Amino acid sequence: MNKFLLVAMLVAPLAVIGADEAKGKKKGEKGFISLFDGKSLDGWKVNKENPKSIVVKDGNIVIDGPRAHLFYDGEVENHNFKNFVLRAEVMTKPSANSGIYFHTKHQDSGRPDAGFEAQVNNTHGDPKKTGGLYAVKDVNPAPAKDNEWFKYEIRVKGKKINIKINGKLTSSWTEVPNAPHLKSMPGRKLGSGTFALQAHDPKSVIHYRNIRVKPLK
């Protein structure tokens, strides 16, 4: 057999497998738009509290320092999201605490009053762990580990919020009028708004990357 023909016969199936794998990787990402370029904080705005707590390093948003919040302020949906799927990859260092806010708005200081927080906390002392809807539908134990990248997904459609960690549903909640446990948090209402990443305290180090969103109708 011609050696070139033999090589072609061996390589062709591998090429097909590679193409199928590539299609598989893209399949779940259709309609998603990147919110972070991996190089800068373009499209994002750090509030005035402690802006040095949030930087870009080695392709990641690195949170390390006193309390601050990084708000998405870019062009996608004019940074005003109602129904969406948000995905990000997150890595926590030991005893770190953070959060991903949604349906929120820029605030110069303090923790955002508007919107909800999806908790990021694997081993911090707070019993409210990663994958929970903070103080609304909490999770314990944590479904992820420190020093390992994990996949975070937040889906909001109508009055329903679903949170997944590494593809597994960890929290599901449907908003109802006058929920008793929300009376002390009047800003915890579904409506629309932007996203924010939290620097919780000086001892918390968290990395975020591959942040993207799929607006839903």
Please place each PLM-identified region on the residue numbering.
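N-terminal export/membrane-targeting signals
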Residues: 1-20
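Carbohydrate-interacting regions of secretory-pathway proteins
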Residues: 18-217
